[in-house]
């Protein structure tokens, strides 16, 4: 099974940027850095400070799925953000199908 990667986008709730950075991003990045199956983990923010995006790449769909249990940051996102988009790419198989119910778009290579 090959690598899986995604981008997840959201709008920052008014007044919540610093709380988001303090209560999610720091711990999220530490969790990802310790996981040998997380190949890429990068949070970015637009210049206006109102939209964020995380890029992640994993060794497999199985390990991507494990992030939802292993990374407590996923449970906190709704406290600070309004999700707007998710794009899933790579060898995702069926393991990540539950993300479709949450609006994820599954992309294929051209």
Task: Please describe what each predicted stretch is.
Residues 1-52, 59-70, 79-110:
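Short S/T/G/P-rich N-terminal loop/turn motif that feeds into the first structured element of a domain
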């Amino acid at each position: 099974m090959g690598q899986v990667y995604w981008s997840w986008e959201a709008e920052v709730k008014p007044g919540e940027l610093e709380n988001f950075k303090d209560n999610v991003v720091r711990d999220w990045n530490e969790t990802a850095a310790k996981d040998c199956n997380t190949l890429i983990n990068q949070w970015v923010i637009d210049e206006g400070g109102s939209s964020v995006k995380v890029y992640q790449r994993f060794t497999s769909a199985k390990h991507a799925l494990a992030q939802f249990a292993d990374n407590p940051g996923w449970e906190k996102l709704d406290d600070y953000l309004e999700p707007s988009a998710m794009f899933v790419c790579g060898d995702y198989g069926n393991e990540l199908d539950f993300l479709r119910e949450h609006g994820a778009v599954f992309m294929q290579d051209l």
